[in-house]
Amino acid sequence: MLTVLAALSLLSLLTSATGRLAPDELCYAEPRRTGSPPNTQPERPPVIFEPPTIAIKAESKGCELILLDPPIDVSYRREDKVNASIAWFFDFGACRMPIAYREYYGCIGNAVPSPETCDAYSFTLIRTEGIVEFTIVNMSLLFQPGIYDSGNFIYSVLLDYHIFTGRVTLEVEKDTNYPCGMIHGLTAYGNINVDETMDNASPHPRAVGCFPEPIDNEAWANVTFTELGIPDPNSFLDDEGDYPNISDCHSWESYTYPNTLRQATGPQTLLVGAVGLRILAQAWKFVGDETYDTIRAEAKNLETHVPSSAAESSLENQSTQEESNSPEVAHLRSVNSDDSTHTGGASNGIQDCDSQLKTVYACLALIGLGTCAMIGLIVYICVLRSKLSSRNFSRAQNVKHRNYQRLEYVA
């Protein structure tokens, strides 16, 4: 049993999976207030309860809008209502910077906590710099990475009384030959040298990622700064000191309330639109005859080249060699699932990552060998004890027999 548990622990530590693109439903820039609104302040500060025990890999390139998912499988749990919280941090090595935090109340026990599966949820604490770059979607972290966002993201989940912590290592492609502004990110404050390339020699599609539909200039006029967690530039109470900075970085044992996080009172759908607004309002880098409309059209055309997960198996045998050599198809990262909710656990991560199959087989072989060794040891101990018992019994009989003869002789 100990061998099996040790092997399963090894499997959980070796689990890795490719990060997923955000579904098209999250790529919008208009203010939406659909769904349940938050109605209370968080009851607890965001903390990392214990060092991460799960390692996950994620990738991003171009203008992709991505979701970092904590791989927590809740399907085995009972439906009894529970409370939950999710905190996201960025790991600078010596300290962790908080990025976003939210609490959920009265959630269905075997469903991923979300505004739809919970009775209520708190205001979202997010890291903002006059714009909304990050937000939480259910339990996942939503943002459009820049080349300076490569690094380790840590999630800290409290589900009822159970703690889940893990590390998501995000690798952002260094190629900046895309129309969006990729020269940004969390590590830019640390003056970390990132090799920026404009490799026009290797052609690839530039319209890769999320390109929200243009909106009217007055669409966000009725949205308050408080709803977005942004300091009011017209208020003397919100000065530059309230903006986040890299100095607000905490050690594992720190339980101080992060100054970098501001309270956003808007619903989840509004904050998702605010992330899309940042994407739409950025300084675009068009080449030649490119316009935003042509880029959006090209992006939609590229999406049609990527088969859906339902039709992927049936289309696999029908794909031609010409299609496989297409630079557009080759450069796109295929998406295995378009669901906005991720409930996969360690086993799902192993199944989705072909590069881990050898490791999985080796670990399963170790489990088998360990089990056989354990059974053999138990059998050996049983046989040894049987022999010892038989020998002791024989000695007792001999002693008894000698004593009997002695008494008979005396008599």
Swiss-Prot record:
At which residues is glycosylation annotated?
N83, N138, N222, N245, N317, N392
Any one of the GO BP annotations:
regulation of neutrophil chemotaxis
- Where do the record's region annotations for Disordered lie? 306-345
| SUPFAM superfamilies (alphabetical) | Immunoglobulin
Show the ranges annotated as biased composition (Polar residues): 306-327, 334-345
* Residues passing through the membrane, by range: 363-379
Keyword annotations for this protein, in alphabetical order, are: Glycoprotein, Membrane, Signal, Transmembrane, Transmembrane helix, Viral envelope protein, Virion
Q: Which InterPro entries match?
A: Herpes_glycop_dom, Ig-like_dom_sf
- Role: Chemokine-binding protein that inhibits neutrophils' chemotaxis.
Question: Know the name of this protein?
Answer: Envelope glycoprotein G
Q: Which organism is it from?
A: Equine herpesvirus 1 (strain Ab4p)
